[in-house]
Amino acid sequence: MKEKWYTIDKKNIFKILNTRVEGLTTKEVNIRLKQYGKNVLPKAKQKTFIQVFFEQFKNPIVYILLITMILSFIIGEYIDGAFILFVILIDAVLGSVQEYRSNKNAEALAKLIRIDALVIRNNKEISIPSEDLVPGDIVLLESGSKVPADLRLIETQNLTIDESLLTGESIPREKSAHILSEECSLSERTNMAYLGTSVMRGRAKGIVVSTSSFTEIGNIAKEVLETDDTITPLQIRMQKFTKQLGMLTAILALIVTTILYFKGYAAKEIFFLVVALSISSIPEGLPVVITLSLSISSNKMAKRNVLVKKLNAVEALGSATIIASDKTGTLTLNEQTVKKIVLPNNETYEVTGVGYNDKGEIKPFKNSKLENIDKLVKEGLYNNEASLSYIDNSWVNFGDSMDTALLSLGYKYNLESESFKNDVLGRIPYESDAGYSCAFYKEGENINVSVKGTLEKILSFCTTKTDKEKIRKQNEDLAKEGYRVLAFATGTIKKFKIKDNYKENDIPKLTFLGLVAFVDPIRPDAKEAIKSCKQAGIKTVMITGDHPLTAFSVAKELELCTNETEITTGLELKEVYESGLDNFDKYIKTKTVFSRVSPIQKLQIVESYKRLGEFIAVTGDGVNDSPALKAANVGIAMGSGTDVAKETGALIITDDKFSSILNGVEEGRCAYDNVRKVTYMLLSCGVSEVVFYILSIALNYDIPLTAVQLLWLNLVTDGIQDVALSFESSEKDILKRKPRDPKESLFDRLLKNEIMLIGLIMGITVFGVWIYLIDVLGYEVSVARSHILLLMVFLQNLHCFNCRSEIHSIFSKPIKENKQLIISIAVVLFIQFIVVENSFLSHLLDSNPIPLVSVLYLFLLSLPIIIVSEILKYFERDKIRRNKNWV
């Protein structure tokens, strides 16, 4: 059913769908159910836990660990092999549990259509499950109901539908049954009602033209299900890291093999030694620590109102270079609020407060007097069909958003709305074609009339001496500021007769009262959050279905843009898109605000930014945001949004505050920082082991540490301390850095320098002490090895403090900020001394007791590692200061 139903008249629609006003017969319904199927959306195939579990093994670093594990078992290092297997399984379980809870898009989409529908079948009104609807069914809508399928409206009475979840527009749309032109965008199709949208007021009759996946929401559902998940920066970096690590290990193995070959070692012995060295150089604990780091940051995010559904999204948010935000409900409250009142004599009043509540006051400008708006405020309460009440410690509202805003205005003026509604004798409901609504009410002995609506319509009722041009200028000025404006007028009826229906000719000559300006206010935290995003190197753009003037007004208030040239519309985007992707991408780079945008265009914008090399996070709360949320590098849903958005997004902002996104960025960057810190520690220690290993072989010394002792360092010392580093809090300047390039290798210049320099210093230190113990002091190899093992433990203990920051001094971060690190070092030292002093354990570790004075000397020998690290950091900070930028 791909016809443009909004362009077809009622008679032809009945003909095309082979239906009638009396509705379909039961026989016709059964035939069509077989033809079109149930009115349900396509479901994504849900993965079992086992499937999710095995997917965790599709990771390059896991491949290396699996190979290492197999080699460990081949050469008889069963403990090492078992440990690596344990690490792989733990990592897989942790990842599986997190992933299994996420990504249930189809179920959430289906929730939108689990509603009953009132239909006419066999010339009778009946209620049926919406899933049983078929094209051609006649559906009846009333206030408070949800639209059960895509409908072409054929009759309407005062119908207003909230389509914000589909179009992004904050203002409910007034509907009619009139034919429209082909150029109408989705939000302008006033003779259509779409699945999942809500009827705010009025009644209507419509014909089902599309069901299930053929509806507008169905199209979005298909886009969501067909869009592949994007790869996060951490995944990209780990893939590169794995390749680099594999290459380095291969080069290392080749070097050692060459040395051993020329020294006359047997082939079997060379194989065992090379494999053992390769095993010691692989950071077996890294996958678990990465998962743990992301989990810790995920928990921190939850405490800061960011719920993480997909673990990789934790770090991904910290890499964002663009945040494409929905306007309605994300940057604004989606609660129309009266902000200004302007009287014909130019008296102006500012109204404070935001949203649907009684918080705020009415402030007169200059010589304006508060009592002069008394009549206008009361008219807004008489001529009102919404409700706003304070129930169980919260404000509850229903009805048209602008009517609700007028009730809020009444509360700020200390007036209760219910008493006014009781005096209403009759109404003329708002119709978009008429452009006004009217209420007849009793006030004392008089019967008065209150009329509100578009300016020109209200002025046509007014005959009193009014400077209409002056009022038009007032209205124009308010519209340019992005306000939505209602005009008010009042009059008295001399002869009033109560009847069922009132018409325009029942309205007497009126007196113009003034203009009321409404705005969907920005969220209090949004402006500062956007400013902070800018400092963090993140550009914020707005994508909305609203009018360009409204969008520009909000963007200007948020300081997103200052020039109208930065705004574009859906029609303009369509023209540029058709001219080719290159032109489209260039065009997108120049824009900050995108208005009147369709869901598919949102997706096109996201894809354009990705082609431009940006790493884009998309926020949203409606169904219309789902394709973009899914396609984005990071999808961020609002907690009060639709289930569709929340299930599609990788993150959910539980308090709906834009500032919480900034919290997420901070924690995301912290998570990646911690991954780098752990990598720095593990690899620098691994390099040190390789250095003293190669030096010993090359210079004909016994190896300073046995395979068991190397394993002890890898499993216990590294294994405990690297976990503690995962708990590091974010550094003070983390939100003043530019986002890292998603394509940047984990092994960037800084990390390479740190790992190689510190690893080299540690390795040479250990080898120097080894020579001194053997050649100068004449220690037995086993005794010397005990000293070297303790020296390595001390070096790794102190190096943990170096790893707390790649740039800042260890003295700039209070130790108390990471209590886990202190505990881990204490535990490592305690275990080390217990093992040395216990005869059974020391035998397993091939270790001997060490005199206290030797312990002191070894500790002092490990201190220079801090000095070297501090010098390296000093030069890095100096480089940053000179470049005025982060590496």
Where are these regions (language model features)?
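Conserved cytosolic headpiece of P-type ATPases
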Residues: M1-P739, E744-F747, L760, I774-D775, ...
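Generic alpha-helical transmembrane segments
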Residues: T717, M762-G763, S786-C800
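Alpha-helical transmembrane segments of multi-pass integral membrane proteins
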Residues: E754-V769, F830
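Membrane-helix interface and helix-disruption motif detector
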Residues: L777-S782
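A C-terminal functional module that forms or caps the active site or interfaces directly
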Residues: C803
